[in-house]
């Protein structure tokens, strides 16, 4: 499994791979500078890691690591300052990454990035509150997302094929 740790120097949060049956053989797969790096998702074929770089409460970025080559690539534009881009997950299609962002908006929205075209489709722009997090079903045909609406959390269920969603009512 993959994990992040500051074990190299106590400050920089590098990415490692470890076989749980042989923890002493953990190997670094990405050396970084700074403590705000963390793993977001692993592709279905185990070839790509999505990695988040947390700069501040108002700025974060998403990267992709090719596990075989060790090549780190920008997913979101690192030059975008003051933009939150995080909580990224691979979608069902190999060219899509689902993530949260406040780019060009007051609120964090759920969005899909087409990796090939770099086009972003914002899915929750009609909700004028922050989307706090989201989670796919195991088959990734549905997802739930949580909003914070005036201090109250609301849950929504989305069909990932057509991106339609509705609020889940009467949660105990």
Feature annotation, model-predicted:
Residues 8-10, 17-38, 54-57, 63-89, ...:
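Multi-bladed beta-propeller domains
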Residues 110:
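Cationic-aromatic interfacial patches
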Residues 1-4, 10:
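Extracytoplasmic/periplasmic ligand-binding sensor regions of membrane-associated signaling proteins
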Residues 1, 40-48, 87-96, 134-142:
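Blade-terminus and WD-like Trp-Asp/Gly-His loop motifs, strongest in beta-propeller folds
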């Amino acid at each position: 499994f993959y994990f992040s740790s500051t074990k190299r120097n106590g400050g920089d949060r590098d990415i490692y791979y470890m076989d749980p049956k042989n923890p002493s053989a953990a190997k670094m797969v990405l050396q970084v500078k700074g403590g705000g790096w963390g793993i977001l998702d692993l592709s279905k074929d185990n070839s790509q890691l999505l990695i988040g770089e947390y700069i501040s409460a108002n700025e974060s970025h998403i990267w992709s690591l090719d596990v075989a080559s060790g090549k780190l690539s920008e997913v979101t534009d690192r030059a975008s300052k003051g933009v939150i881009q995080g909580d990224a997950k691979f979608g069902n299609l190999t060219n899509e990454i689902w993530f949260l962002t406040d780019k060009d908006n007051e609120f964090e929205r759920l969005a899909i990035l087409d990796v090939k075209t770099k086009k972003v489709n914002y899915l929750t722009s009609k909700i004028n509150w922050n989307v706090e997090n989201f989670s796919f079903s195991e088959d990734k045909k549905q997802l739930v997302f949580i909003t914070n609406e005036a201090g109250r959390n609301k849950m929504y269920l989305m069909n990932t094929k057509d991106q339609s969603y509705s609020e889940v009512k009467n949660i105990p």
